[in-house]
Curated annotation (Swiss-Prot):
Subcellular location: Cytoplasm; Nucleus, Nucleoplasm
Pfam family, one: Amidase
GO biological process, one term: auxin biosynthetic process
Domain of life: Eukaryota
Catalytic reaction annotation: a monocarboxylic acid amide + H2O = a monocarboxylate + NH4(+)
Descriptive protein name: Amidase 1
List of catalytic residues: K38 (charge relay system), S115 (charge relay system), S139 (acyl-ester intermediate)
Molecular function via GO: amidase activity
Biological role stated in the UniProt entry: Amidase involved in auxin biosynthesis. Converts indole-3-acetamide (IAM) to indole-3-acetate, and phenyl-2-acetamide (PAM) to phenyl-2-acetate. Substrate preference is PAM > IAM.
PROSITE patterns, per the entry: AMIDASES
Gene (UniProt): AMI1
InterPro entries: Amidase_CS, Amidase_dom, AS_sf
Cellular component GO terms, alphabetical: cytoplasm; nucleoplasm
Length: 435
């Protein structure tokens, strides 16, 4: 039986609880695993809610089920229902005015991250083994970091987004969460059937100090932890500690006309990364408008505070003469990052610029945090490269994470490296934080 509206007994993670059973076979690769589905994936016969009651009210039940949901079921997993998300996928915060904010299991009183908030919470609270989300600007990576779990944003375009409500197709990426690497690997082999990559050691690991300075405080010492872990597990000779901002400035010439706009920030920032973020958000806004302006203008939906202003700004934005420049920067950036990482290089960066903000944080400090977050999130976002957020544990009662990024299509290599490095990361974090 379906139950609408997640109760707080499930940490407020679920929109609707129901069972979608797999085929009756114990030989399937995901047999015995349960999963939850972000309320952005179509399920035949059910209305896809997209985080907003007016959207649900004005849309018919889906005619077909998302291929990625079908793939998980066909591989033996059992779905336990759909999860709450931020309205129209236009937030990385995780708060929903209409359905309630899912409770962050590892940091109550802090936001769970969005827009795949319920999917992350369902995994972190041990309600399911894995869950499906989407990531346009950070909506898998951020909730994973805030909830202390693994989150994979695959290479853009490699997992079908058919029968998934679009936010901005240029960046929309289906991803997934798990509590452990074994499950993450099992799910990835099913949902991302790329050729196996047997390489487990990177040829280079770039750990840019300027990206870690965006944190504003190095108290969690993740920069030292990742450097020590790579040197110990692999070889210090493969460490590359260049500044990513300088690399971008030198290799993405089209950012020149925008760079001065971001050179006077009082926030901890990297101007070149601020431009990359500006470009991605501009392109995202343009595509969101093309997808949803007609519905917003016709229905005039009830939208939550903060998010309402962001959506209406996107809808009201004119044809931006900078879009051609933005596309040029996107192409140059992807090419430059590919040249940096080559086939088997890794980029290590913070997933987010600090601990999860408190629920109900005031708008100004929250916007500052968002700006710094997108400087980091736009690296994989604009390039389309794959990224996995790795939980390092709790520091002062709050979750800490780090991310590894690899070139487009190197998803299985990326997971190989995570599997090789993870225990060393945990050991180094434990040792560093206890000293």
């Amino acid at each position: 039986m379906a139950m609408a509206g997640g109760g707080r007994g499930d940490y407020g993670a679920f929109m609707e609880r129901f069972v979608l059973p797999p085929p009756p076979s114990q030989q399937l690769p995901l047999h015995g695993l349960t999963f939850a589905i972000k309320d952005i994936f179509d399920i035949a016969g059910r209305v896809t809610g997209f985080g907003n009651p007016d959207w649900a009210r004005t849309h018919a039940p889906a005619a077909a089920t998302s291929p990625v949901v079908l793939a998980a079921l066909a591989a033996g997993a059992t779905s336990l229902g759909t999860t709450i998300m931020d309205e129209m996928a236009y937030s990385i915060n995780g708060e929903n005015t209409h359905y309630g904010t899912p409770t962050n299991p590892c940091a109550p009183g802090r936001v769970p991250g969005g827009s795949s908030s319920g999917s992350a919470v369902a995994v972190a609270a041990n309600l399911v083994d894995f869950s499906l989300g989407t990531d346009t600007g950070g909506s898998v990576r951020v909730p994973a970091a805030y909830c202390g779990i693994f989150g994979l944003r695959p290479s853009h375009g490699l997992v079908s987004a058919e029968n998934v409500i679009p936010m901005a197709q240029m960046f929309d990426t289906v991803g997934w969460f798990s509590r452990d690497l074994s499950t993450l690997s099992r799910v990835t082999k099913v949902l991302l059937p790329l050729p196996d990559d047997i390489v487990k050691q990177p040829t280079q690991v770039t750990i840019p100090m300027d990206c870690f300075q965006i944190l504003g405080s190095l108290d969690d010492r993740t920069y030292q932890i990742i450097n020590a872990s790579v040197a110990k597990r692999f070889d210090s000779q493969i460490l590359d500690n260049r500044n990513l901002g300088d690399f971008i400035s030198d290799n993405v010439p089209s950012i020149g006309k925008f760079i001065t706009d971001f050179s006077e920030s009082e926030l901890p920032s990297v101007p070149a990364l601020s431009v990359i973020s500006h470009v991605m958000r501009g392109l995202q806004r343009s595509q969101f408008k093309a997808n949803h302006a007609e519905w917003v203008n016709t229905v005039k939906p009830n939208l939550g505070p903060g998010l309402r202003e962001r959506i209406l700004e996107a809808i009201a934005s004119g044809d931006n003469e900078s879009l051609e420049d933005f596309q040029a920067i996107r192409a140059e950036f992807k090419s430059a990052l590919a040249a940096l990482l080559k086939d088997h290089g890794i980029l290590a960066i913070p997933t987010v610029p600090g601990p999860p903000p408190k629920v109900g944080m005031e708008a100004a400090p929250l916007e500052n945090f968002r700006a710094r977050a997108f400087s980091l999130l736009s690296i994989a976002g604009l390039s389309g490269f794959c990224q996995v957020s790795i939980p390092l544990g709790m520091r002062n009662g709050l979750p800490v994470s780090v991310s590894l990024v690899a070139r487009h299509g190197a998803d299985h290599f990326l997971l190989n490296v995570v599997e090789e490095l993870y225990q060393t990361l945990i050991d180094e974090a434990t040792k560093t934080w206890s000293s």
